[in-house]
């Protein structure tokens, strides 16, 4: 299997003991717009900005990202999957995916500690 490419927004994770690539592609984001009942990407970003997320939202995001990464799964499959690190690992993975999609410069910096961090 190919390695994840952070420049394309891909994230690598161990799920059900297998290394998988996840990516919130445009198709995955369109899928999430429908799932969350919003009309555009800006509304989707606003929806995620408050940092509150239920389990069903995480399933939708992880499912869309798995499919965006080329994995043949549906949300029913995702419900039963085990992310390395348990629920905490799933929360971190979801946050990384959203960061890669909506703030790619931060994900690249986090993945590469040698890259200078922007001042806040």
Range-by-range predicted roles:
Residues 1-14, 39-51, 68-120:
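Charged interaction scaffolds used for protein-protein
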Residues 26-43:
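Short, surface-exposed, low-complexity cationic segments
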């Amino acid at each position: 299997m190919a390695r994840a490419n952070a420049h394309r927004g891909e994230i690598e994770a161990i799920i059900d003991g297998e290394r998988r690539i996840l990516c919130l592609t445009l198709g995955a984001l369109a899928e999430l717009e429908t799932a969350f009942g919003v009309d555009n990407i800006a509304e989707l970003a606003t929806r995620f900005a408050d940092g509150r997320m239920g389990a069903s939202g995480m399933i939708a995001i992880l499912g869309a990202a798995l499919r965006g990464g080329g994995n043949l799964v549906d949300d029913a499959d995702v419900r039963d999957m085990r992310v390395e690190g348990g629920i905490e690992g799933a929360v971190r993975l979801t946050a990384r995916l959203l960061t890669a999609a909506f703030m790619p410069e931060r994900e690249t910096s986090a993945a590469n500690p040698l890259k200078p961090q922007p001042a806040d």
